[in-house]
Amino acid sequence: PECVRQQNARGSRARVVTRAQTRSRWSAAGPGSHGGLSVTKVLIGLNLLVFVLELLTGATGIMGGGSAQAMLRLGALWPAAVLVQHEYWRMFTAMFLHDGILHIAFNMWALWVVGGYMEVAVGRLKFVVLYLISGLAGSVLVLVAAPVDSLVVGASGAIFGIFGALAVHAFLNRGRDFQSRALLGNVLFLLVINLMFTFSAGRVSWQAHIGGLLAGAVTVFAMMLGGRKDPRRPFGTID
């Protein structure tokens, strides 16, 4: 860059280059910025398509509500159906269902904010594994701790897992670069806000949120132990 060539002192040039590289790595960590197909965008698109199906079948209305029977037919998580009738597939399908436009809008916004960073950090395949494990873990805790007549839908468990994974990843890399330290503070702030909402708002499945959060944190920790860090890629990328 021209600003680098105009520097007279070698140390000043080095500082300018370092700052430019830091900004470049930070901006490269956004959703889909690693090139090719973005899993985060695919997941958002899939959730939106399923939401349209919910509207068409009456499983939900624009502002929520709708037919509980229609939601069950689409795969909502009903503990009684899983534990008694062994409909284990509901633990997976419920992750793609939402109750109203506000529910899906908030979840997809959160997925867009944190999903792209985590996808860059661990890679597409491991991001999918992390997402699914977190969502399924949230469903497991619903089965264990929620009333058997609960009807649970939403991607919140999987998204909380991404939050937990991103927090652990940034914490373990906090001494390596500035963006990891900054990211850690931002993620922890968002986590605190979301946890406050989880335990203060009505009709929110804390079981799905906490189950996903813990599973995401543990899963990415295991990935980092089993992988190697490459300092040339954002956030100490896991291979």
Identify the residue ranges that each predicted region occupies.
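A detector for small-residue-rich transmembrane helices and their helix-helix packing motifs
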Residues: 2-239
